């Protein structure tokens, strides 16, 4: 009896784009042979808003409220790099108290960023319960931000050239220490619930392995780089703000798989708590803003045919003049190296404002990681990268 041969042709599957509040508007064109992934092509750009061009047509004070829309899980990091760029270009010093306040806000944002990564990542691999836990803890961080800045999730508009917009209110530091005490126990609870769970371990161990050489060659940063055994943290390398005043460790893992990246992020939350405790205990007195940096310099005069005269019908507002020159500034966000290349032309607006988003670079390795894996592993690998499409597309 003759048997019919079965031939299977590759199937092309579109994953996404989804709503920005979910996994984001990332579209993956996946080529499948049965359950195996042959090829993957990421399609980006659905959330492009021209942030760099907007920055080149705004003064720094006007642009700071915009920047929370890059990475809407890490608004404080975006504000920090936006004011750090002209600060470094113009050599504007920051008072010690303002630097401590900035560090506290950045580390709170690092915890909030890792929490918002942790919940959806675990939901993707089948653990639904922690997804609800993380919002309970993030709510307390929102309360602290609301007390200090007036806003909760994004658009805090708190960082300024030379300092911060306002000093911390009375009793805020005590509330922050109370949060650290509360959250320390919650991280222990997460680890008991998740880390040694056999189902979770089988879903993420040995999946999406990135070697040390691959991580360096693909220019990865943040937990993606440290999860492959590279001890590289810009808080230690660049010595920005006042991180050298505190005792903390750079967390690494050697395996390079999804589980290693999970462990790095969970342990980084513990290190952030250590930094916040030390900053709250040792914060000095003094001004929260460099008053010399507030000096106003009038911009160029309006021409009758110029766009500012025709459409705004007033002269350019007095504000900081960005001196001529160019500079690259970077910091360690929750996702990796967030950088800005700024080029000034002795005007109130930068001539060039290039944003180096960490998740844009980290996303490049996804097609290589997905080749040969099963369909069920796609979300585990993509989730371990920690991508926010507002930051990728800008």
Curated annotation (Swiss-Prot):
SUPFAM superfamilies: HydB/Nqo4-like. InterPro entries: NADH_Q_OxRdtase_suD (IPR001135), NADH_UbQ_OxRdtase_49kDa_CS (IPR014029), NDH1_su_D/H (IPR022885), NiFe-Hase_large (IPR029014). Its EC number is 7.1.1.-. It is an enzyme of class 7 (translocase). One of its GO terms (cellular component) is plasma membrane-derived thylakoid membrane. The keyword Ion transport does not apply. It is found in: Cellular thylakoid membrane. It catalyses: a plastoquinone + NADH + (n+1) H(+)(in) = a plastoquinol + NAD(+) + n H(+)(out); a plastoquinone + NADPH + (n+1) H(+)(in) = a plastoquinol + NADP(+) + n H(+)(out). Gene3D superfamilies: Cytochrome-c3 Hydrogenase, chain B. It comes from the Bacteria. Signal peptide: none annotated. Pfam families: Complex1_49kDa. GO terms for molecular function: NAD binding; oxidoreductase activity, acting on NAD(P)H, quinone or similar compound as acceptor; quinone binding. Keywords: Membrane, NAD, NADP, Plastoquinone, Quinone, Thylakoid, Translocase, Transport. NDH-1 can be composed of about 15 different subunits; different subcomplexes with different compositions have been identified which probably have different functions. NDH-1 shuttles electrons from an unknown electron donor, via FMN and iron-sulfur (Fe-S) centers, to quinones in the respiratory and/or the photosynthetic chain. The immediate electron acceptor for the enzyme in this species is believed to be plastoquinone. Couples the redox reaction to proton translocation, and thus conserves the redox energy in a proton gradient. Cyanobacterial NDH-1 also plays a role in inorganic carbon-concentration. Belongs to the complex I 49 kDa subunit family. This is NAD(P)H-quinone oxidoreductase subunit H. It comes from Synechococcus elongatus (strain ATCC 33912 / PCC 7942 / FACHB-805). The gene is ndhH.
């Amino acid at each position: 009896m003759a048997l019919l041969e079965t031939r299977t042709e590759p199937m092309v599957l579109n994953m996404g784009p989804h709503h920005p509040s979910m996994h984001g508007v990332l579209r993956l064109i996946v080529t499948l042979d049965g359950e195996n992934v042959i090829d993957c092509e990421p399609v980006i750009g659905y959330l492009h808003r021209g942030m760099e061009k907007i920055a080149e047509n705004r003064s720094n004070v006007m642009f700071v409220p915009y920047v929370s829309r890059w990475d809407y899980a890490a608004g404080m990091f975006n504000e920090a790099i936006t004011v750090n760029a002209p600060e470094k270009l113009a050599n504007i010093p920051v008072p010690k108290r303002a630097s401590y306040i900035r560090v506290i806000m950045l580390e709170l944002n690092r915890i909030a960023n890792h929490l918002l990564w942790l919940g959806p990542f675990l939901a993707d691999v089948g653990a639904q319960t922690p997804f609800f836990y993380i919002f309970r803890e993030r709510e307390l961080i929102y309360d602290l931000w609301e007390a200090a800045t007036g806003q909760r999730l994004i658009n805090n508009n708190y960082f300024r050239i030379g300092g911060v917009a306002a000093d911390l209110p009375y009793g805020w530091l005590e509330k922050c220490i109370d949060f650290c005490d509360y959250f320390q126990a919650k991280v222990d609870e997460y680890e008991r619930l998740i880390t040694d769970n056999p189902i979770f371990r089988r879903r993420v161990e040995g999946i999406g392995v990135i070697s040390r050489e691959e991580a360096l060659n693909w220019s990865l940063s943040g937990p993606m780089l440290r999860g492959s055994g590279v001890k590289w943290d810009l808080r230690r390398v660049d010595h920005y703000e006042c991180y050298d005043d505190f005792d903390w460790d750079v967390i690494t893992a050697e395996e390079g798989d999804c589980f290693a990246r999970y462990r790095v992020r969970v342990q980084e939350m513990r290190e952030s708590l250590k930094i916040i405790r030390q900053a709250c205990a040792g914060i000095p007195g003094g001004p929260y803003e460099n008053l010399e940096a507030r000096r106003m310099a009038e911009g160029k005069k309006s021409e009758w045919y110029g766009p500012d005269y025709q459409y705004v019908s007033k002269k350019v507002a007095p504000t900081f003049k960005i001196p001529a020159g160019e500079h690259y500034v970077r910091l360690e966000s929750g996702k990796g190296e967030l950088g800005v290349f700024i080029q000034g032309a002795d005007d109130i607006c930068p001539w060039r404002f290039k944003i180096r988003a960490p998740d844009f670079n980290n996303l490049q390795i996804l097609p290589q990681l997905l080749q040969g894996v099963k369909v069920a592993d796609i979300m585990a690998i993509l989730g371990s990268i920690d991508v926010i499409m507002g930051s990728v597309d800008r």
